[in-house]
């Protein structure tokens, strides 16, 4: 039989699917979309993306972004790999247990996707200088913590500047794409500070963390979680006075588990397991690999849409529920025009004689701020830092000087203040906000009717 003529296979371009989005027009493109190879190359060569979190969602995000044409990625995560991560955080292997998540995730994606460069950062997000985050075009969030989201939201909104008419300056907008999952549920959202609601504008979407009354834990435990929290919150302090409990220390977790078992047996309560103990103590949110994959895909697509304008971005909050079938919905939430984080800032009118120390006291007394232990920055100029002690000592002499002089004798300017805000339950949270300072009596400044309590 004669040999059949088999046509040679044409190699498929790695960017074939991406080219369909970036090289041609469409009915749903953003008005600013300019298709062409140059756009694809710019995304590859110049766009820098920071992925925060290298867990279940973060692993998916790194993979999806690398396969979507982004070549300059960085990832930050403070955690190390645990055995319990391996079933859903697909970039990790058993031999990786104990290693930093960010470093292993970056290494694995670079091994699989040629040409991509991923810089890992094994650290807390708070340990990075604020300007570190300003070096990126987009920040993609794969976090499981409300506190971490609020911190990054404050940082990104801190870069935002407003025009005289209180419209945001486009070049100062730091886009964020936020994803979150819990079991079969998830969300993806686009945050354009000053344009769409920031995280603080919609904080009401997140329910308060469940807390157990201590009297219930001590006297009438009714379920396994009560027994675990009793061992964690009460017995640990009683037995190990002065020793800090470390949830990432296996010996500490084993001690809590053993004590919870004894407590449960005493009251005839079933269900205490080691995995449940970890979940209760560390407030672990249940995660499913398929949910992470779906939400990550939505986040990666929104990231591509923001940088390329190949389609209009999500407006502005996508919810997903895969518990009973498949359900998605997009909701348009509105900005809080008086938001202390993404808004133009609280307006405070001062005399030119007001000292920095007096101004910091005013921040604590202001009814809309209630900001204690405040640090103050004016652009790149640090006026005062509460911590670390060596910096506080360095800036301390400024406290007695007029704020007007420290700010370069400008008539008005926007400054950033970082401190702790009092909550209704007497707890405090770290926050960043903007304050618009106007000096009465300075040349060229007309009297304003906005007082310190406005």
Curated annotation (Swiss-Prot):
- The UniProt record gives the binding positions of ATP as 56-80
Could you say which enzyme class this protein belongs to? ligase
Q: Which reaction does it catalyse?
A: ATP + [NEDD8 protein] + [E1 NEDD8-activating enzyme]-L-cysteine = AMP + diphosphate + [E1 NEDD8-activating enzyme]-S-[NEDD8 protein]-yl-L-cysteine
Its Enzyme Commission number? 6.2.1.64
Residues with the modification N-acetylalanine, per the entry, are: 2
* Gene Ontology terms for molecular function: ATP binding; NEDD8 activating enzyme activity; protein heterodimerization activity
Its keywords, alphabetically, are:
Acetylation, ATP-binding, Ligase, Nucleotide-binding, Nucleus, Ubl conjugation pathway
> Which BP terms in the Gene Ontology apply to this protein?
protein neddylation
One Pfam assignment: E2_bind
Q: Where is the active site?
A: 215
Q: What induces it?
A: No accumulation in response to auxin treatment.
**Is Ligase found in the keyword set?**
yes
Q: Name its cellular compartments.
A: Nucleus
User: CDD domains attached here?
Assistant: Uba3_RUB (cd01488)
Q: So which tissues is this one expressed in?
A: Expressed in shoot, root and floral meristems, in vascular tissues of cotyledons and mature leaves, and in the stele of the root.
What do the Gene Ontology cellular component annotations say? cytosol; nucleus
Q: Does the keyword ATP-binding apply?
A: yes
Q: What else is known?
A: The formation of the adenylate intermediate is possible in absence of AXR1 and without the participation of Cys-215.
Q: Which PANTHER family match?
A: NEDD8-ACTIVATING ENZYME E1 CATALYTIC SUBUNIT, UBIQUITIN-ACTIVATING ENZYME E1
Its annotated function is as follows:
Catalytic subunit of the dimeric ECR1-AXR1 E1 enzyme. E1 activates NEDD8/RUB1 by first adenylating its C-terminal glycine residue with ATP, thereafter linking this residue to the side chain of the catalytic cysteine, yielding a NEDD8-ECR1 thioester and free AMP. E1 finally transfers NEDD8 to the catalytic cysteine of RCE1.
Similarity section: Belongs to the ubiquitin-activating E1 family. UBA3 subfamily.
Q: What is this protein called in UniProt?
A: NEDD8-activating enzyme E1 catalytic subunit
Q: Which organism is it from?
A: Arabidopsis thaliana (Mouse-ear cress)
